[in-house]
Amino acid sequence: MKNKKKFFGDKKMMIPTIPTPDELLDKGFSRAKKTASEVRSKKMPKRLKPKKIEEARVITACQVIKDRLKMINDRVPTIEELPEFYQDYIDITVGVDDMKQALGALNWAYGIITQLEKDYSKKIRRSPPEKASTLRSQAYGRISSVVHKISKDLDILDFAKNRLRNMPTIDFEATTIVIAGFPNVGKSTLLSQITDAEPEVADYPFTTKGIQIGHIERHWKHIQIIDTPGLLDRPIVDMNDIEMNAMVALEDLADAILFIFDSSETCGYPLEQQFNLLEEIEEIFNAPIKILFNKMDISDYYNNGSRFEYVNNFIEKIEEPLLISAMEGKGIDEILKLLDSVKKIEREDY
């Protein structure tokens, strides 16, 4: 079976329905039974008919099972041909090695069943009529054994289908901005303020609400903005290795990071702790990082209040930060101009 696969235009891993071994065998054997009835109704020498019937059953059963295995294999995109982000996503959620092994097992089964089809067709043609049924039963037994040997591999592919069907749809030609910052700093509010429509929500490992993707069209430039609640909003030291991999996978997407501070600290995290998170993200991502100080309207900053010097101490550490209030819609135009300035990073995804 040729291992020729395609990467679909909508960027999704469209794995077909995966049958169980019994479902696969039932379909093959039931179709073979219908074929046998058709052969039985034809006129031919009495001595030849039993052999033709049983040969047709073997060939049909093998062909039906092989066609299903080939269809599964052909419709799963070649992992190495996917953009790096999707390769990482599959590895984190399913396991690239497990998927490759499962697809390899389907190739193996296809080859063995092809050989069984040839061998038993020949045996039945050369056998006495009274032995044709016995040989067909032997063939069915061998076919069943092969299919049951790939039971775990079919389970892996079924698991992959369920885990990957809601994977994010990414436009790799768009300029991509990834939002970071502690919970409740105003990321969702900002996303809704600057994007054209309700953000798409898709599955992403270790996010609390799924990855959220918003889109903006600016001067014939498509910008997608990604928020990952539960991932880029806590200290890296608290993450395990798999969570770290999920975060690093975003490096394959980001043309820039939009890091949001809550200047009022009403999010529950002191500015110093927020600043530490920024420094950790700077160590992970090579993409440029743009800094916003949100909730400036309630930070007592503009009134030269008691928190002015405290907040200003952190603002002065940042080169060209934007001071905004996402809830009030203040600073949105400046943010959009900032996004206009982000240049797409050229990557070899294909």
Kindly label every feature range from the protein language model.
Residues 287-290, 297-350:
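Canonical P-loop GTPase G-domain recognition
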Residues 103-158:
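Charged, amphipathic alpha-helical linker segments immediately N-terminal to NTP-binding catalytic cores
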Residues 190-191:
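Post-Walker A alpha-helix
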Residues 169-172, 194-224, 228-248, 271, ...:
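Switch I (effector-binding) loop of TRAFAC-class P-loop GTPase G-domains
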Residues 159-170:
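Pre-Walker A adenine-sensing motif
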Residues 187:
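Conserved lysine of the Walker
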Residues 1-109:
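N-terminal accessory targeting/assembly segments
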Residues 238-265, 276-285:
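Inter-motif core of Ras-like GTPase G domains
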